[in-house]
C-alpha cells in the first residue's frame, strides 16, 4: 500500500495565495462577498477615505499609517474603482505581505505565474503591510524597478505601519518611484468633519474647504457663522468624538449608540503590546503604566526621566518605548519653536500627542481603575491633530519634518500651536466656555501672531 503525500513548493503556494487573494481575476462580482468590504458596509458608516484617489500610472506610492486605520479597506475600495473604470481584471494584483521575506517579494514579481494582460498594458501592484516583510525588501523593490522593464512601468502601492522602515525605504527607492508629485500618502483616523458627516442627525450646510492659512479669513468667518444654527448638535458630536475618536471600528460603535466594543479595545491593545512593543521586555502592567503616565502629560512638555521614575523604569527604556509608539504612527511630536525661525528648539522638551482618543484612553478602557484623560487635554490633542491632518494632506512631504510647534512667550506662557503655514495665526485651545479666557487671549496678544481661540462652544 502506498501513501501519496501532497508536495508544494514555496512558489507554488504563493501562486495559490494569489488566486485566492485576487478573486476579481475570475469573478466580476467579487466585492459582494469580500469580507473586508462587507464588514465596512455592515458597520453602517460607509466611510471612504479617498487616500488612494488619483493614482497615476507608473508611480510607486507609499501609504503609511497605523494598523487598523483602514488601509486594507482603502486598497480594496480602490481596486473596485479601478475595475469599474475599465482596468482589465488581470492587471490588478494585491498581496498581504505581513510575515513575508524579501525573497518572497522577489519571487512574486519574477517567478509566480500571473494571468496574461492585454498588449501594451501595465499592472497595478498593491503590496499591503510591506514594512512587515523581513529582510531588505526595499532593496529587492529597487532591483526590480531597475532590472525588470515591465515592473518598472507598473504602478505600485506599498503600505506599512512602521515609520522607521518606510523612511528607510524612501531613501533606498529614491529615483525609482516615477514622476509623480504626490507619491507619499498618509492615512490617519478620520477627522471631525468626516465624523460629523456620519453621525449628524440633521444635514449640515455644505462646508467650504478652508486651508490652514485661511483660518482668520472672511471665508472662514462666514463658514463659522453658517454653522451657528447647528451649534448644539456640533457640541454634542465633539464630545462624542473626544470619547470615540476616528478609527472606523470605533466610529461604527458611536453610530450604533454603543460603547467602544471590547473586541476593538483588545485589537488596539494588541496593536500596541504585540506589534509596536514586540521587542519590549517590559511586562504588560509596566508598559500600560508607562502609556497611562505618558498620555496623562500630553498638555505639557514631556519629561521622560520623570515618567520613567514614576513607573519604575530607567530613562533609556522610556525613550525606547516612546520610539516604538512613534514608529507605529501612534503618536506625534510637537516641538518648541526656536526663537526667530521655524525650527524645533533642540534644547527644549517636545510635547507628545496620541494620534487618536482611543490610543490615549486605552489604559482606562481596559481597566477603569486607571485614570481617563481629561477632556480638556483630549480637546487640545484633537485640535492639534486636525491641523496636522490637513497640513499632511496639503503638503505630503511635511510629515517627514517638523511643521507644527508650541511657543513659549517671554512671560513663560505657552501657546498651543503655531506654524508658518498658518499665515500669521496662532491657535490656543479653550475647552469650556465658563471661567476666565482673557488670560489665554492676553498670551496670544503678546505674541508675534494674531490669535485664534478654539473652543467647543462660543465664548
Locate predicted features.
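Conserved lysine of the Walker
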Residues: 71-72
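Short glycine-rich substrate-engagement loop in P-loop NTPases that contacts/grips substrate
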Residues: 90-121
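Accessory nucleic acid-recognition modules appended to NTPase machines
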Residues: 2, 9, 251-415, 419-421
Amino acid at each position: 500500500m502506498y501513501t501519496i503525500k501532497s508536495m508544494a513548493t514555496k512558489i507554488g503556494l504563493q501562486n495559490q495565495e494569489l488566486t485566492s487573494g485576487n478573486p476579481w481575476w475570475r469573478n466580476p462580482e467579487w466585492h459582494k462577498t469580500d469580507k473586508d468590504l462587507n464588514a465596512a458596509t455592515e458597520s453602517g458608516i460607509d466611510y471612504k477615505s479617498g487616500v488612494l484617489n488619483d493614482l497615476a500610472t507608473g508611480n510607486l506610492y507609499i501609504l503609511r499609517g497605523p494598523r487598523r486605520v483602514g488601509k486594507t479597506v482603502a486598497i480594496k475600495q480602490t481596486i473596485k474603482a479601478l475595475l469599474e473604470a475599465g482596468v482589465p481584471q488581470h492587471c490588478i494584483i494585491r498581496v498581504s505581505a505581513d510575515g513575508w521575506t524579501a525573497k518572497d517579494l522577489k519571487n512574486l514579481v519574477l517567478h509566480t505565474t500571473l494571468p496574461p494582460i492585454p498588449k501594451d498594458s501595465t499592472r497595478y501592484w498593491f503590496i499591503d503591510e510591506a514594512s512587515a516583510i523581513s529582510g531588505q525588501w526595499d532593496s529587492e523593490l529597487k532591483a526590480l524597478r531597475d532590472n525588470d522593464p515591465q515592473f518598472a512601468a507598473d504602478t505600485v502601492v506599498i503600505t506599512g505601519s512602521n515609520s522607521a522602515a518606510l523612511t528607510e525605504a524612501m531613501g533606498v527607492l529614491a529615483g525609482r518611484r516615477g514622476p509623480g508629485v504626490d507619491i507619499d500618502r498618509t492615512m490617519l483616523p478620520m477627522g471631525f468633519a468626516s465624523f460629523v458627516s456620519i453621525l449628524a442627525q440633521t444635514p449640515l450646510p455644505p462646508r467650504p474647504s478652508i486651508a490652514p492659512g485661511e483660518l482668520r479669513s472672511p471665508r472662514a468667518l462666514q463658514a463659522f457663522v453658517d454653522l451657528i444654527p447647528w451649534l448644539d448638535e456640533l457640541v454634542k458630536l465633539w464630545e462624542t468624538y473626544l470619547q470615540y475618536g476616528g478609527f472606523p471600528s470605533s466610529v461604527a460603535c458611536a453610530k450604533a449608540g454603543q460603547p467602544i466594543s471590547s473586541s476593538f479595545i483588545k485589537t488596539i491593545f494588541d496593536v500596541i503590546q504585540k506589534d509596536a512593543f514586540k521587542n519590549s521586555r517590559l511586562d504588560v502592567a509596566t508598559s500600560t503604566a508607562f502609556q497611562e503616565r505618558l498620555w496623562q502629560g500630553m498638555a505639557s512638555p514631556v519629561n521622560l526621566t520623570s515618567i520613567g521614575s514614576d513607573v519604575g523604569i530607567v530613562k533609556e527604556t522610556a525613550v525606547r518605548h516612546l520610539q516604538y509608539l512613534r514608529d507605529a504612527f501612534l503618536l506625534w511630536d510637537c516641538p518648541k519653536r526656536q526663537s526667530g525661525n521655524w525650527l524645533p528648539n533642540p534644547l527644549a522638551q517636545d510635547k507628545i500627542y496620541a494620534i487618536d482618543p482611543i490610543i490615549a484612553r486605552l489604559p482606562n478602557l481596559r481597566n477603569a481603575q486607571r485614570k481617563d484623560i481629561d477632556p480638556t487635554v483630549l480637546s487640545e490633542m484633537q485640535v492639534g491633530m486636525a491641523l496636522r491632518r490637513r497640513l499632511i494632506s496639503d503638503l505630503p512631504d511635511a510629515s517627514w519634518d517638523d511643521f507644527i510647534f508650541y511657543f513659549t512667550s517671554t512671560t513663560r506662557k505657552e501657546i498651543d500651536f503655531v506654524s508658518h503655514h498658518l499665515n500669521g495665526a496662532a491657535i490656543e485651545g479653550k475647552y469650556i466656555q465658563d471661567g476666565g479666557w482673557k488670560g489665554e487671549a492676553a498670551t496670544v496678544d503678546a505674541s508675534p501672531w494674531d490669535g485664534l481661540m478654539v473652543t467647543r462652544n462660543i465664548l
